[in-house]
Each structure stands twice: as C-alpha cells, then as structure tokens.
Design a protein with these regions (language model features):
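Conserved acetyl-CoA pyrophosphate-binding loop and the N-cap/start of the following alpha-helix
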Residues: 77, 81-90
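A short beta-loop-alpha structural element at the N-terminal edge
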Residues: 1-16
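Conserved GNAT acetyl-CoA-binding A-motif
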Residues: 94-108
Length: 145
C-alpha cells in the first residue's frame, strides 16, 4: 500500500476513519473538520493509503504552514508502516531544508505513545511544550533531507 493524494471520492471513508479514532483528538469538531477536509482535498493537502476503496491511513497538512495537521491509521491496520509511508510522502512534497512541524501529545501521555514513536522514527525531534484546546501537547520538528 502506498500514499497518494486524497480525492473527493475518499471523503466518506476518511470521515468514517475520523469517527473511529476521534477520541484521540481533543477538541475535534466533526462539522468543522468536514468543511476543512473538503477544502484540503481540493488544495491537494491530503494523503491517503487505501485498501480497495477503504481509507486505512489519512494525513492532512498545510503547504503554507508547513505543518502536518492530522494523521490517523485504522486500528486494524496499525503496525503495517502505513503511518511511516504517509509521513515520508508528506515530507517528500517539500524542498530540502524546509522545516516541517506537527503537534502531538506530550511524553508520558498514553494517547501519544504511538504517534511520538512514529514521528521520532521518521526523524522528527522534540520541540516546544504547548497547550492546544486546553490539552498539554508538544511540537515536533523535521528538517527535510
């Protein structure tokens, strides 16, 4: 399975994945998320990994902000390097030397254990401790090689 740009036809399957993992995203407003997702698909700021027509991995990002804003892998497909494939594809869209960022959970938060491991494996380094939606988080940084 490989990461490709998301398309309008992936919308419903993507939303099903979001509903499945929504507990891991504090402050997620599904109505607002749907509106933003449509816009991101149109701007080619989404990547998916699919099994048939089913979205099993999804990544949203911003070219302008140089930020990975959403990453999820279907629970039944974890440990298959789907997250790694998505992150590698994301980084490949930017020029060498570009500073990319992602916000994830802080060290010690069980919700962020898998994400932090993935980002570190992909070459991200720990950045500032921040608070998002009244939840303690941490920024991770990656310099495109």
């Amino acid at each position: 399975m490989r990461a490709v740009f998301g398309e309008k036809g992936d919308f419903e399957s993507w939303i099903e994945l979001v509903k499945l993992v929504s507990g891991n995203f504090p402050g997620l407003d599904l109505k607002c998320y749907k509106d933003v997702l449509i816009e991101k698909i149109e701007k080619k700021e989404t990547l998916v990994v699919k099994e048939g027509e089913k979205v099993v991995g999804a990544l949203a990002f911003s070219y302008e902000e140089k930020e990975l804003s959403f990453l999820a892998v279907h629970p039944e497909y974890r440990q298959e390097n789907i997250g790694t494939e998505l992150v590698k594809k994301f980084a490949s869209l930017f020029e060498v030397g570009t500073k990319l960022s992602v916000i994830t959970y802080r060290d010690g938060d069980i919700k962020g254990k898998g994400a932090r491991k993935l980002y570190k494996k992909a070459g991200f380094s720990e950045g500032d401790l921040i608070t998002v939606f009244d939840y303690p988080c941490q920024e991770f940084i990656y310099i495109v090689k």
